[in-house]
Amino acid sequence: MDAKTDDKDGGKCPFPHGGGRGRRNSDWWPEHLDISLLHRNSTLSDPMGKGFDYAREFESLDLDAVIKDLHALMTDSQDWWPADFGHYGGLMVRMAWHSAGTYRTTDGRGGAGAGQQRFAPLNSWPDNANLDKARRLLWPIKQKYGNKISWADLYVLTGNVALESMGFKTFGFAGGRADTWEPEELFWGPEGSWLGDERYSGERELSDPLGAVQMGLIYVNPEGPNGNPDPVAAAKDIRETFARMAMNDEETVALIAGGHTFGKTHGAGDPSLIGAEPEGGALEDQGLGWKSSFGTGFGADAITGGPEVIWTQTPTQWSNHFFENLFGFEWELDKSPAGAKQWKAKGAEANIPDPFDPTKKRLPTMLTTDLSLRFDPAYEKISRRFLENPDQFADAFARAWFKLTHRDMGPKVRYRGKLVPKEDLIWQDPIPPVDHELVGDKDIAALKAKILGSGLSVSQLVSAAFASASTYRHSDKRGGANGARIRFAPQKDWEVNQPSDLAQVLSKLEAIQKEFNGAQTDGKKVSLADLIVLGGCAAVEKAAKDAGTDIQVPFTPGRMDALEEQTDADSFKVLEPRADGFRNFIGKRKQYMSPEESLVDRAQLLNLTAPEMTALLGGLRVLGGNVGHTTHGVFTERPEKLTNDFFVNLLDMKTAWSPSATTEVVYEGRDRKTGELRWTGTRVDLIFGSHSQLRALAEVYAQSDAQPKFARDFVAAWTKVMNADRFDIVAK
């Protein structure tokens, strides 16, 4: 209603003018379930078009030429943003680190995989101050090589080249990160101001899924917890935040010390003289932020944050000086020119170079979080070993850096380029390559018949297949049916996977696998991973046929079975869902979202659209996919048949819904005239009748002519989940 009418065109301008931007639906109804995240970063916002294959483009890239240009860039200091010590290495390492460092294990989101650092809010986080300059320095190279290298890959590659140009041998590099074209609206914290810290409860318990201590930081406050310069207390924050990025103590020490072997921090003057961040800047600033009125605003006068620290005597060369200085001096608290808390070496000579004046020397300085590596007992032990064994330090940093920058890429089949390391690493969730002939159509038909004749129900087969495949997270490409890791701890014991039923299904499928493979004479085999999925597909086909719909569920063999020694059980714990609306499950662990929010979150991790989510859930309900075999949301008199009954009966106006008087989060649907109990459902079920957008989708599937379309749409969504981790299919 704030929009003005354009008299000439006789319509309303979609942009707000005058008194405000106008109210959005979310302003009127802030508690309304937001399903828009299911449609972000769609092909409609991608300028490359549907036929663009980035992985193929990258493989045609002259990688040596790019690397040569990046090496030249490192020492080509620009007047508009001069390089510290005549070398951009430290700046570029920080850019790559901060691109990758947003990754968090809890939900797999963040990380370097999509080039999100160029979008809000990351491009304007306080911890990313002046990284806009690093990206602008890279623009001529990105412009030169065009679509053959993404921003996401270029950030990481630049970090690697920066390290190599300063004398460090990296572990390797993989390309293949395709750019996205709009910001990811992730939950970065509840705070409404930069550096707020309302994310803690109890004894400094950090809320899930967050991976940083304050809003706008990558990890921790370098001055200490909330600015308290206590290295031991800071170590607790470091350990927690780095663990949430999948790093153990050794990797953490190696990363901090390795990164701080290079470059400097920038606190040359009063931080209040820094201008707005990129997203808050003036139009004429063209996306550059943090314009400073202190001195020249750059070079020796640059202000990025508070501390003004240079860690080593050779900030553009790989060395062991970080540990030599850390243990070689005693440290006293000091303040930077910007007023930030930092530490200086007691009784030391000034042997640290100035970044711009070769005639000046500085005292050795450290951050509070650097001293944590000496004063935390566990970190101290590792740090002393690295001090005494520089080769171990170099190897640990190389491996940790590779893990940091590749953790969210998923399995090695997604890696591209000639610099990919040959070694398989446990955090890559390796799966053996296919080493046998795959089953053909006749074999598949025979195996389906064998599975359906095994005594396993439609519900059991569907539940096992969905449990195996639905661990997939599109965020970091982990999980999924390939590998059949559902037969290992911890997945086989998760409550959501119904361990007793699962064990029965796996036992019968393993027997079928053994019998089939033992009968072959031509080297043909079927994996258990394939059989689990095939069992679900066969059950869906049977359920559709029993409902009067003949439909074939696509199945592509080629999954392999991972070995237990290839599986880091602890790392898979984060894949266990607290809640899963598709299976009408709410776990015993603390919930951070409502059940319906958890459903949308799970759908987004599975890379589903709202229509796909709707069809999939409606089908799973009637097929008996609920955990514990509950009847909540099973709105049908024909269970284990693939009907559209869930939608028909949910939208039936003969039923009136009310909260259950005996069971929390359960609702009772009673006959409006007689009061007789007809159905029970959860919040997840009823949201498809309550939420206007989801109701519109439910209506499509509740119509009298909807059964064939529903069956097709369910099968399409089912197949998408079953194949979510089949990157080998995409590669072919």
From Swiss-Prot:
Crosslink feature (Tryptophyl-tyrosyl-methioninium (Trp-Tyr) (with M-245)) location: W97-Y219
Keyword Repressor: no
Pfam families in the record: peroxidase (PF00141)
GO BP, sorted A to Z: cellular response to hydrogen peroxide; hydrogen peroxide catabolic process
GO CC annotations, alphabetized: cytosol
Composition-biased stretches (Basic and acidic residues): 1-11
Catalytic activity: H2O2 + AH2 = A + 2 H2O; 2 H2O2 = O2 + 2 H2O
EC number(s) recorded for this UniProt protein: 1.11.1.21
Residue stretches spanning the membrane: none
Cofactor remark from the record: Binds 1 heme b (iron(II)-protoporphyrin IX) group per dimer.
Keywords: Heme, Hydrogen peroxide, Iron, Metal-binding, Oxidoreductase, Peroxidase
GO molecular function: catalase activity; heme binding; metal ion binding
Binding site for heme b: H260
Domain of life: Bacteria
Tryptophyl-tyrosyl-methioninium (Tyr-Met) (with W-97) cross-link, renumbered residues: Y219-M245
Modification after translation: Formation of the three residue Trp-Tyr-Met cross-link is important for the catalase, but not the peroxidase activity of the enzyme.
Cited HAMAP family: Catal_peroxid
Description of how the protein assembles with itself and partners: Homodimer or homotetramer.
This protein's name: Catalase-peroxidase
Organism: Rhodopseudomonas palustris (strain HaA2)
Native organism taxonomy: Bacteria, Pseudomonadati, Pseudomonadota, Alphaproteobacteria, Hyphomicrobiales
